[in-house]
Amino acid sequence: MRNFRRLISTILLSAIGVVTAFSQTSVKVSGVVTSADDGLPMIGVAVMDGNGNGVVTSLDGDYEITVAPGTELTFSSIGFNDEKVVVPQAETFTHNVVMQPETMKLDDVVVIAYGVRKKGTVAGSVSTVKSEKLENTPTAAFDQALQGQVAGLTVLSNTGEPSASASMKIRGTNSINSGTSPLYILDGVEISAADFNTINPADIESMSVLKDASSTSIYGARAANGVIVITTKRGRNMDRPNINFRTQLGWSAIAHGNWDLMTTAERIQYEKEIGMTSGQNYDYLSKIDVNWMDVVFNDAAMLQSYELSVSGATDKTNYYLSGSYYDQEGVAPGSMFERYSLRYNFEHQMAKWLKMGANTMFNYQNIQQADEGAYALVTPISAARFMLPYWDPYKADGSLASINDGTWKGQGQNPLEWLENNPLAYKKYKVFSTLFADFNIYKNLTFKTQFGFDFSHTTGFSQSFASYKPNLGEGMASRSSSDGLNLQWTNTLNYRFDIDNIHDFNFLLGHEWQDYHTERFSVRSEGQTNDYLTDISTGTRVTSWDSMATSDYSRVSFFGRAEYNYADRYYAEASLRADGSSRFGKNNRWGLFGAVGFMWNLRNEDFMLDCREWMNQAQISFSTGTSGNSEIPNYEHLALISGGADYIGDSGVAPVQPGNENLTWENTWTSNLGFHFGFWNRLNVDLELYAKRTTDMLMSVPLSYAQSNGYGYMWDNVGAMVNMGAEINVNATVLQLKDFSWNVNANVGYNYNEITELYNGVQEYELANTNTKLVVGHPLGEFYINRYAGVNPANGDALWYDKDENLTTELKDSDKVLVGNTFHAPWQGGFGTALTWKGISLSAQFSWVADRYMLNNDRYFDESNGRFATYNQSRRLLDRWKQPGDVTDIPRHGVFTEFDSRLLEDASFLRLKNLMLSYNLPSGLLKKTVVIRGLRVYAQAQNLLTFTNFSGLDPEGTNNLYAAQYPMSRQFTFGLDLMF
């Protein structure tokens, strides 16, 4: 019995010892995980101990895990920064966690070609524009939001028509005739600028502007003009779905309305002075005073948009679903843009070794476009300049004055009535999708295959009604149809590994195939007799048709990239790409492009240790390499013949294109030197210097330079051009207090352009009908024009300078000279500021271009000085020369205005691109609603102010001639953002 009690005592003491020992080597950790966004519990947060063991939080955000003292626990959730805690020595430990959104993580990621990189580890020149700069812009497309945002990126619009896209150039113009726009990549697939308005700006996560060879060379033959990579949104939050609703309502008016045409009183005075009084009843006409700018342009063109998105993620799946509606009236009559769009981005981890996904967009557009760019009495934009102020477009009852009933008293036709009887509309359908699969073949070895599908179908329908008197009882209907199909298949193999956590290697091999097919059809019929039945089938005869107009283009590519990182101090990368294109002949079908880049992270050097407290970034980068340009029409290398030729009454075929099997790629060699510094985590300064040389420039060459064989032009590789420049970008947090912050930003870009070689030793070539000339040693687009010298005060004659600087009254082409001005802006940039106090934010962003010139063709008509006296004229003609001794720059009546330097105007401008005032309701107040996680209201103005010396309706434009241009609009919108 004694032995039994001794045994029991021993067992109990041993058990107590074991329990005591265990209590000293394990800790029960528990707590609640909430979101910093709204303070609500987070479900599904992973709590891991570093050995692969862990738990996830419950529906209420609770967790409980038992680990050893000293264990570091990591709390992680998609869309949030990781949180870490070291478990102390204790029996129990309660630790509540507040998860911070991974805004900084997203900001630290840079999207590059075929991948992403952490900011500060990229040797190339890459500028990133995040979603907050794009999603609230009240425009149909994202392009306008980029103006003034990126150093070296020039964004200009040749029209303010709502559906039109802007023109972009990165670091100047590299080519004379070939394409000068960047390559646009949407979720890995090439798109064109015409597709901009199909993308809802709120669906964009980020845009990366790739500028130098190290960044662009891996895109090869398409990247000489830079690359813009667009990435759409993904689901990120793990605790529950994010539901966002956004709406904007507003109106538009002309952004910059310089209007100096005569009023009725001034017109009557002018007519009396020049003797145009025959048959005029001035007592009656003086009672009518119409400002045709107010008649033609709408100062309250409505704009509305609605967007709804749902996004979320689990440990295996992330998704983003959005639907939107956008409707904008144009400021010019007969123009509007309406868009319905749906996007679904989806990724799922099928297995540890396989992830699959798709990014899909469906889009429908209804477009009406106003005629512009041509001078006619019936097209409203140009007619607004021609109509006399005493021609009233309306009857007394407010209806349109009509040529049908004789109530229209003006010359020709009432442009508003013409527009009503000649409608033109387009409908566009688009499906864009990328399907991809990621295979984790082996540790750090992945293979990705992606297939892109881009299909668009556009139809156009125009009518002219039989009841319209000028049609003499016969109507017209025209239909057009065009289809485009772009298929792209990309395969990449990526292997990444490190040695001793010091040497980091990353290798990429890839293959890409692209096929692009287009076809169009159009038909026109006439003879319709009923306005309501004005269609193709109701005409009595077909007057024109165009069918089977197809075009195909294909490309095959192989590429690779190698990257090396030593201890986060030294970075090196090299890329190589081979492209084969159907646009070139058998002699030069393949092109090879490559680049190298280096970056030195000074901050991580030992000798910079004492500077790290106040210097958060110090990097120097250098890159050099080549990229190509193949943007020419299809089939230009082929010698072609065409049927339908007639010779002495017999039909036959005739040569129409000489062909050139030696046609090859345009090649641009780019070198870039960059300096990137950050101070006190509040001031960042980036300075970059670059030099580009384009050789084998693609140009449609006049064959008279080389031979006379009956052909006018032939595509060939003609010469060389250089672009050199500098860019500086500054971002600063001026003040950062508890409830107040003030941030500023500014960027400046300068580009010098020079033609260094032309065709077959030719030193100069005048471009017909442009008043510009290509000259070796001079910039592209330099004006070649007669110099206006003013007016002879004795007799009112116009004076010009001849080539020898002598005054002359004769205007001769032989006296034209290069005047040193170009329509390509060498200077561009932007600056802005943002003030935030508690939930209130005020931001402003400006954009500008400088030293840019355009010929104002409108003045050729408005200041014709007698040539077009039957149209309304500029009030400046009232100050023309009238008698000996008058000092003025406008000659006497009858001395017509010519295309000379008087029409050449400085089109530099400074524009307040965006001004926004917003208010975010406090999260504490929103918690009471349970459902609403965020609410923001805002008011903003787009293109609010414009400062310029240009006398036209708008200083923006993409070429040397400003002619009857659709002006940019000023927009005022009010918005509401709701987050659930």
Task: Show which residues each predicted segment covers.
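Short glycine/threonine-rich loop-to-helix capping motif typified by GTGT followed
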Residues: K586-W590
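Residues on the lipid-exposed face of transmembrane beta-strands in outer-membrane beta-barrel proteins
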Residues: T232, L308-G312, L342-H348, S433-F439, ...
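Short, small/polar-rich motifs associated with maturation and membrane association
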Residues: M1-Y344, H348-N363, D405, F432, ...
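Conserved C-terminal beta-signal and adjacent last beta-strands/turns
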Residues: N743, T822-A850, T897-F947, Q965-F980
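Repeated loop/turn-to-beta-strand initiation elements of outer-membrane beta-barrel proteins
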Residues: K316-Y319, W353-M356, N444-F447, H503, ...
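Surface-exposed loop/interface segments of Gram-negative outer-membrane beta-barrel transport/assembly proteins
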Residues: K105, G120, N237-V290, G330-F337, ...
